[in-house]
Amino acid sequence: MLVVVAYDVNTETKEGRKRLRHVAKFCTNVGIRLQNSVFECHVDAAECKVLKHRLEQAIDTERDSLRFYYLGNRYQSKVEHIG
């Protein structure tokens, strides 16, 4: 399935910058970077659960945010790429 992950990590503190590096590195290992904080991840259901869990553990929910867009297995008709 295709899952698009977008994140915003507060980097005002040293801990925030460390969280950002951790989230970015994990996403880079799992998916393809589309923008600085947006990744396209082709995963199965089990990998998706691990992805979500690991990212939830990495952020500070009071300062940071995550978004998961679940496009499923038939995502080709839902995604248009120009340029």
Regions inferred by a protein language model and the residue ranges of each:
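Extended, hydrophobic alpha-helical segments
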Residues: 1-34, 38, 42, 46-47
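Short, intrinsically disordered low-complexity segments
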Residues: 35-65, 70-78
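Short, low-order "capping/linker" segments at domain edges
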Residues: 80-83
